[in-house]
Amino acid sequence: MFKNINIFEARKEGYKTYRVPGITVTKNDVVLVTAEARPNEGSDWDSNDVILRRSLDAGKTFQNRQIVANHSDFGKGPISNFVLIPDLTTGKIIAVFCWKYSRVFRMFSENDGETFSEPEEIASTFEQFLKDYNWRVCATGPGHGIQLQSGRMIIPVWLSDGTGNEMGEGNLGHRPSVVSSIHSDDCGISWERGEIICRHGDDINGETLINPSETIAVQQNNGTILFNIRSESLIDRRLIAHSPDGATNWNIQGFDDALLEPVCMASILKSNYNNEQNLKEILFVNPDNLENDLIPTGRNLRHDRKLSLIHISEPTRRTT
């Protein structure tokens, strides 16, 4: 059923490692795969670029890589958290990403990711958050955003006040943190902020929420928006929240017992195919693991990032 294809290979072409992958499919069925290309030690704060590879045959083969966001075009500091959204009406591809975890840009492609427009900053969108949270670090996604049936585009975001010291001397910390969203109703031209959904220290059904961050989104069959949230909470489960529009009136369902949290990026999407109940199944994938016997000395990780597993949910949950 599954076939492994090595799209990005570590320690080649000038980069030590590739992190934070993203994948999307255009209106014309071109597969776009992105990753942060990290030199040096491969850390969040290295001189990271974002590279892209395209497939014209449903992922069987991929064209040569292209650098779609080069840190040297911006200055010192990493490019990160690259998010793609295809507009399935016009075919335009919208890309949103961060530089130095403090400035956010968007750009467009009208040829299925072959080329992109010049980046334009969307600073005013994130300035709106300062009314509720004095952030110094911001990040979009990562992975991919979503487009609703109404045409609205939604990207989860996380913000930090930067007071943590876990990123080393001279770098702002990524903790403590909060989670929110941004949305666009004009095909990615302008963006507005959503409500803050949850904050570090919140009480979630008796469990303390610790450093919520990378969040993934999906529109459920009933039209509501589900956010699946990474955190460092000691319960080691993914946090689930719902909203009618992806921006307001968030309801935090709680931690999902079925979805382990190794403190790592995950992905979620809705299938294009209807099941026997005429509903589209939702697929969730992450490292389904709480062991910690492979972590190298000195790495600040709680669990090994291994054993990727696909969970299928709707109308009943089951795991494959």
Question: What do the PLM-derived regions correspond to, one by one?
Answer:
Residues 29-33, 90-95, 151-156, 223-226, ...:
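Entry beta-strands of beta-propeller and related beta-repeat scaffolds
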Residues 46-92:
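Blade-loop segments of beta-propeller domains
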Residues 36-45, 158-174, 287-302:
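Short, conserved, GDST-rich strand-edge loop motifs in beta-rich repeat architectures
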Residues 19-22, 78-83, 141-144, 213-216, ...:
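Beta-propeller and closely related beta-sheet repeat lectin domains
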Residues 238, 257-309:
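Loop/turn-rich, solvent-exposed surfaces of beta-rich toroidal or solenoidal domains
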Residues 49-58, 106-112, 177-187, 240-245, ...:
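Beta-propeller blade signature
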Residues 310-320:
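Single conserved hydrophobic/aromatic residue that forms the stacking wall/gate
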Residues 79-83, 96-147:
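Asp-box/WD-like beta-propeller blade repeats and closely related beta-sheet repeat scaffolds
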